[in-house]
Amino acid sequence: SGDRRFDLAALYYGLQLQLVVYMNAAMEMEARRHPDKEIVPAAMLYYHVTDPMVESQVELSPQEINEQILEQLRMNGVVCGEEDIIQRLDREMGDKSTVIPVEKKKDGSYSARSSVMSSQELGLVSAYVSHKVRQIGQEILGGHKEVNPYEKGSNEACTYCAYKKVCGFDPGIPGYRRRLLKELDRQEAFESMEEELGDEHRIYAGSTEGH
């Protein structure tokens, strides 16, 4: 129900795994149903459940009102950048989709406002989240339960924590520190994932190609 935004750096740090966990589960189910086929993810998207309101200083036509409503309801997340997949997700798309976070420039390439990944990048994200979930599970089973909140830019784990009043964390007491998480751009996040996973999933690090 919240207006959630996909954050690749937050995913790398293990703070935003749920959407990819769901995608992986769906892919595993489809792989069991269709063992003779390659399962390719098309997208992983958030849909904000809301009742949009249109405000305007000028009178709008019914079509203009509908376009603004669709704009507010457009899903966000990540879409596979293969053209046939995008056409299946939004068959009526022109230069800008009202359904998925994809826009095209005049030359047909995706604009900077688009949220697309290649199938290789989606595969890397999928493998990394599976690795991260196993890692976190092993830490839980190993008894790791330290009070160790993060700070990433202006975001702090304690801000909306339901247990803030009982956990006892106080940065004013010596020994209590937040984990300071570095901001990562898209390529840095992908390369950091590759470093943890090893050569099998390497599509960025060591490459001279720009992304």
Regions found by a protein language model. Give the residues of each.
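Structural signature of nuclease core domains in nucleic-acid processing machines
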Residues: 1-211
